[in-house]
Amino acid sequence: MVTGVFYHPSFSRRSYLTLGTRLKDFPSAFEEIRHPKLRILESPRVSDELILKVHTPRHVEEVKSDSLCSTAWHSAGGVVKAAEMVYGGELRNAFCYIGAGGHHAGRDYFWGYCCFNDVVLAVQNLYDEFGRMKVAVIDTDAHHGDGTRQLVDLLDFQVLHYCICSTDYVSKDGLKIDVSYFSQDYLDAVEEFCERAETFGPEIIFWYFGHDTHVGEYGDIGLTVKDYIDIAKILRELAEKVCEGKLIVVLGGGSIPEIAKESTLAVIRVLLG
Protein backbone atom coordinates (compact mmCIF):
# COMPACT_ATOMS: atom_id res chain seq x y z
CA MET A 1 0.00 0.00 0.00
CA VAL A 2 1.23 3.46 -0.90
CA THR A 3 0.98 6.96 0.53
CA GLY A 4 -0.82 9.42 -1.70
CA VAL A 5 0.21 13.07 -1.93
CA PHE A 6 -2.39 15.33 -3.55
CA TYR A 7 -1.24 18.55 -5.21
CA HIS A 8 -2.29 20.88 -8.02
CA PRO A 9 -0.01 23.33 -9.89
CA SER A 10 -2.35 26.21 -9.05
CA PHE A 11 -1.43 25.86 -5.36
CA SER A 12 2.05 27.24 -6.05
CA ARG A 13 0.73 30.35 -7.75
CA ARG A 14 -0.36 33.41 -5.82
CA SER A 15 -3.88 33.11 -4.40
CA TYR A 16 -4.54 34.25 -0.86
CA LEU A 17 -1.95 36.80 0.18
CA THR A 18 -0.85 34.77 3.19
CA LEU A 19 -0.95 31.30 1.65
CA GLY A 20 -0.25 32.01 -1.99
CA THR A 21 3.55 31.91 -2.17
CA ARG A 22 4.38 29.39 0.54
CA LEU A 23 4.42 26.47 -1.92
CA LYS A 24 6.78 28.19 -4.37
CA ASP A 25 9.27 25.30 -4.00
CA PHE A 26 6.69 22.76 -5.21
CA PRO A 27 6.32 20.47 -7.07
CA SER A 28 10.13 20.24 -7.46
CA ALA A 29 10.46 19.68 -3.69
CA PHE A 30 8.90 16.24 -4.10
CA GLU A 31 12.20 15.12 -5.65
CA GLU A 32 13.65 15.16 -2.12
CA ILE A 33 11.39 12.33 -0.98
CA ARG A 34 11.69 9.78 -3.76
CA HIS A 35 10.22 6.59 -2.32
CA PRO A 36 8.76 3.45 -3.91
CA LYS A 37 5.60 3.80 -1.83
CA LEU A 38 5.02 7.48 -2.63
CA ARG A 39 2.40 8.35 -5.22
CA ILE A 40 1.93 11.98 -6.34
CA LEU A 41 -1.59 12.64 -7.61
CA GLU A 42 -3.08 15.78 -9.14
CA SER A 43 -5.98 17.08 -7.06
CA PRO A 44 -9.19 16.92 -9.10
CA ARG A 45 -11.88 19.57 -9.12
CA VAL A 46 -14.68 18.96 -6.61
CA SER A 47 -18.18 18.90 -8.09
CA ASP A 48 -20.69 21.66 -7.43
CA GLU A 49 -23.22 18.90 -6.75
CA LEU A 50 -21.23 17.75 -3.72
CA ILE A 51 -20.51 21.31 -2.59
CA LEU A 52 -24.24 22.09 -2.51
CA LYS A 53 -24.82 19.23 -0.09
CA VAL A 54 -22.67 21.13 2.43
CA HIS A 55 -22.80 24.83 1.47
CA THR A 56 -25.67 27.07 0.36
CA PRO A 57 -26.07 28.26 -3.25
CA ARG A 58 -25.31 31.80 -2.08
CA HIS A 59 -22.06 30.59 -0.51
CA VAL A 60 -21.02 28.97 -3.78
CA GLU A 61 -21.79 32.14 -5.75
CA GLU A 62 -19.80 34.27 -3.31
CA VAL A 63 -16.81 31.94 -3.59
CA LYS A 64 -17.06 32.08 -7.39
CA SER A 65 -16.97 35.87 -7.28
CA ASP A 66 -13.93 35.96 -4.97
CA SER A 67 -10.77 35.89 -7.10
CA LEU A 68 -8.76 34.79 -4.08
CA CYS A 69 -10.74 31.52 -4.04
CA SER A 70 -9.62 30.44 -7.50
CA THR A 71 -7.91 27.33 -6.10
CA ALA A 72 -10.83 26.31 -3.87
CA TRP A 73 -12.32 23.63 -6.15
CA HIS A 74 -9.05 21.74 -6.57
CA SER A 75 -8.12 22.24 -2.92
CA ALA A 76 -11.33 20.60 -1.72
CA GLY A 77 -11.29 18.08 -4.54
CA GLY A 78 -7.94 16.69 -3.45
CA VAL A 79 -9.18 16.07 0.09
CA VAL A 80 -12.39 14.46 -1.17
CA LYS A 81 -10.49 12.15 -3.52
CA ALA A 82 -7.84 11.31 -0.92
CA ALA A 83 -10.45 10.23 1.61
CA GLU A 84 -12.27 8.16 -0.99
CA MET A 85 -9.09 6.37 -2.06
CA VAL A 86 -7.85 5.76 1.48
CA TYR A 87 -11.17 4.48 2.75
CA GLY A 88 -11.62 2.39 -0.40
CA GLY A 89 -8.25 0.71 0.11
CA GLU A 90 -6.38 2.20 -2.85
CA LEU A 91 -4.01 4.16 -0.59
CA ARG A 92 -2.65 3.48 2.88
CA ASN A 93 -2.84 7.15 3.92
CA ALA A 94 -2.59 10.56 2.29
CA PHE A 95 -1.27 14.12 2.55
CA CYS A 96 -3.25 16.89 0.85
CA TYR A 97 -1.71 20.20 -0.18
CA ILE A 98 -4.18 23.06 -0.64
CA GLY A 99 -4.31 26.50 -2.21
CA ALA A 100 -7.29 27.69 -0.18
CA GLY A 101 -8.12 26.46 3.30
CA GLY A 102 -11.28 24.88 4.64
CA HIS A 103 -11.85 24.93 8.39
CA HIS A 104 -13.20 28.51 8.56
CA ALA A 105 -15.85 27.75 5.92
CA GLY A 106 -19.30 27.17 7.40
CA ARG A 107 -22.68 26.49 5.84
CA ASP A 108 -23.02 29.98 4.36
CA TYR A 109 -19.89 31.90 5.32
CA PHE A 110 -16.13 31.78 4.77
CA TRP A 111 -13.19 33.76 6.08
CA GLY A 112 -9.54 33.36 7.15
CA TYR A 113 -8.14 32.17 3.79
CA CYS A 114 -10.82 29.44 3.59
CA CYS A 115 -13.48 28.95 0.89
CA PHE A 116 -15.07 25.46 0.95
CA ASN A 117 -14.88 23.12 3.94
CA ASP A 118 -12.69 20.42 2.44
CA VAL A 119 -12.86 17.94 5.32
CA VAL A 120 -16.64 18.15 5.68
CA LEU A 121 -17.03 17.72 1.91
CA ALA A 122 -14.82 14.63 2.15
CA VAL A 123 -16.95 13.19 4.95
CA GLN A 124 -20.15 13.91 3.02
CA ASN A 125 -18.69 12.09 0.01
CA LEU A 126 -17.71 9.11 2.18
CA TYR A 127 -21.26 8.95 3.51
CA ASP A 128 -22.61 9.08 -0.04
CA GLU A 129 -20.26 6.39 -1.33
CA PHE A 130 -19.89 4.04 1.65
CA GLY A 131 -22.68 4.88 4.12
CA ARG A 132 -22.58 6.59 7.50
CA MET A 133 -19.53 5.97 9.63
CA LYS A 134 -17.67 7.38 12.60
CA VAL A 135 -15.00 9.93 11.70
CA ALA A 136 -12.40 11.64 13.90
CA VAL A 137 -10.97 15.08 13.09
CA ILE A 138 -8.07 16.66 14.96
CA ASP A 139 -7.27 20.29 14.14
CA THR A 140 -3.79 21.55 15.09
CA ASP A 141 -3.97 24.77 13.11
CA ALA A 142 -3.34 27.83 15.30
CA HIS A 143 -6.97 28.93 15.00
CA HIS A 144 -10.27 27.29 15.89
CA GLY A 145 -12.03 25.30 13.16
CA ASP A 146 -15.33 27.11 13.56
CA GLY A 147 -16.69 26.21 10.14
CA THR A 148 -16.07 22.51 10.64
CA ARG A 149 -17.65 22.63 14.08
CA GLN A 150 -20.79 24.32 12.74
CA LEU A 151 -21.16 21.92 9.84
CA VAL A 152 -20.72 18.64 11.72
CA ASP A 153 -23.50 19.85 14.03
CA LEU A 154 -25.83 21.03 11.27
CA LEU A 155 -25.34 17.93 9.13
CA ASP A 156 -25.60 15.55 12.10
CA PHE A 157 -22.38 13.74 11.25
CA GLN A 158 -20.92 11.06 13.53
CA VAL A 159 -17.73 13.06 14.09
CA LEU A 160 -15.32 13.48 16.98
CA HIS A 161 -14.05 17.03 16.38
CA TYR A 162 -11.05 17.99 18.50
CA CYS A 163 -9.38 21.42 18.20
CA ILE A 164 -6.21 22.44 19.97
CA CYS A 165 -6.68 26.21 20.08
CA SER A 166 -6.89 29.00 22.66
CA THR A 167 -9.95 27.94 24.69
CA ASP A 168 -11.24 24.94 26.63
CA TYR A 169 -14.65 23.45 25.84
CA VAL A 170 -16.41 20.08 25.84
CA SER A 171 -19.90 19.62 24.36
CA LYS A 172 -22.62 17.70 26.18
CA ASP A 173 -22.19 14.69 23.91
CA GLY A 174 -18.42 14.74 24.47
CA LEU A 175 -17.66 14.81 20.74
CA LYS A 176 -16.86 18.50 20.21
CA ILE A 177 -13.78 19.42 22.19
CA ASP A 178 -11.53 22.47 22.33
CA VAL A 179 -8.28 22.27 24.27
CA SER A 180 -6.25 25.37 25.04
CA TYR A 181 -2.57 25.14 24.18
CA PHE A 182 -2.05 27.45 27.17
CA SER A 183 -3.46 24.93 29.66
CA GLN A 184 -1.31 21.84 28.97
CA ASP A 185 1.65 20.49 27.01
CA TYR A 186 0.82 20.33 23.29
CA LEU A 187 1.74 16.68 22.82
CA ASP A 188 -0.27 15.80 25.92
CA ALA A 189 -3.29 17.36 24.20
CA VAL A 190 -2.65 15.19 21.14
CA GLU A 191 -2.43 12.12 23.36
CA GLU A 192 -5.76 13.10 24.95
CA PHE A 193 -7.31 13.13 21.49
CA CYS A 194 -5.93 9.64 20.92
CA GLU A 195 -7.56 8.38 24.11
CA ARG A 196 -10.90 9.86 23.09
CA ALA A 197 -10.56 8.47 19.57
CA GLU A 198 -9.84 4.97 20.83
CA THR A 199 -13.05 5.09 22.84
CA PHE A 200 -15.01 6.61 19.95
CA GLY A 201 -13.80 4.11 17.35
CA PRO A 202 -13.53 6.06 14.06
CA GLU A 203 -13.23 4.32 10.70
CA ILE A 204 -11.02 7.10 9.33
CA ILE A 205 -9.08 10.03 10.84
CA PHE A 206 -8.47 13.52 9.42
CA TRP A 207 -5.64 15.70 10.70
CA TYR A 208 -5.98 19.38 9.84
CA PHE A 209 -2.30 20.38 10.01
CA GLY A 210 -1.32 24.05 10.08
CA HIS A 211 2.33 25.06 10.27
CA ASP A 212 1.17 28.54 11.34
CA THR A 213 1.94 27.33 14.89
CA HIS A 214 5.68 27.20 14.09
CA VAL A 215 8.22 29.54 15.66
CA GLY A 216 8.26 32.75 13.59
CA GLU A 217 4.92 32.10 11.85
CA TYR A 218 1.87 34.36 12.16
CA GLY A 219 0.27 31.96 14.68
CA ASP A 220 3.53 31.20 16.51
CA ILE A 221 2.95 29.13 19.67
CA GLY A 222 6.49 27.83 19.81
CA LEU A 223 6.19 24.58 17.86
CA THR A 224 8.92 23.25 15.57
CA VAL A 225 9.25 20.69 12.79
CA LYS A 226 10.33 18.16 15.42
CA ASP A 227 6.97 18.66 17.15
CA TYR A 228 5.14 18.08 13.87
CA ILE A 229 7.09 14.86 13.35
CA ASP A 230 6.16 13.70 16.86
CA ILE A 231 2.47 14.52 16.26
CA ALA A 232 2.55 12.69 12.92
CA LYS A 233 4.03 9.59 14.54
CA ILE A 234 1.41 9.64 17.30
CA LEU A 235 -1.46 10.00 14.84
CA ARG A 236 -0.09 7.39 12.43
CA GLU A 237 0.15 4.90 15.30
CA LEU A 238 -3.38 5.79 16.41
CA ALA A 239 -4.73 5.24 12.90
CA GLU A 240 -2.97 1.89 12.64
CA LYS A 241 -4.50 0.88 15.96
CA VAL A 242 -8.12 1.96 15.44
CA CYS A 243 -8.83 2.19 11.69
CA GLU A 244 -6.29 0.13 9.73
CA GLY A 245 -4.03 3.15 9.18
CA LYS A 246 -6.64 5.30 7.43
CA LEU A 247 -5.26 8.80 8.03
CA ILE A 248 -5.72 11.90 5.87
CA VAL A 249 -3.47 14.90 6.58
CA VAL A 250 -4.85 18.18 5.23
CA LEU A 251 -2.58 21.21 5.06
CA GLY A 252 -3.91 24.20 6.96
CA GLY A 253 -2.46 27.62 7.76
CA GLY A 254 1.06 28.94 7.47
CA SER A 255 2.90 31.41 5.25
CA ILE A 256 6.67 30.87 5.28
CA PRO A 257 7.93 28.84 2.28
CA GLU A 258 10.91 27.32 4.08
CA ILE A 259 8.72 26.09 6.95
CA ALA A 260 6.07 24.83 4.53
CA LYS A 261 8.63 22.78 2.64
CA GLU A 262 10.47 21.34 5.64
CA SER A 263 7.39 20.58 7.74
CA THR A 264 5.22 19.03 5.03
CA LEU A 265 7.98 16.83 3.67
CA ALA A 266 8.77 15.71 7.22
CA VAL A 267 5.16 14.70 7.83
CA ILE A 268 5.00 12.85 4.50
CA ARG A 269 8.12 10.89 5.46
CA VAL A 270 6.36 9.79 8.65
CA LEU A 271 3.32 8.68 6.65
CA LEU A 272 5.61 6.62 4.44
CA GLY A 273 6.95 4.89 7.55
Model-derived features: positions:
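N-terminal low-complexity, Ser/Thr- and acidic-residue-enriched intrinsically disordered segments
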Residues: 1-52
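A general "terminal functional-core" signal
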Residues: 53-273
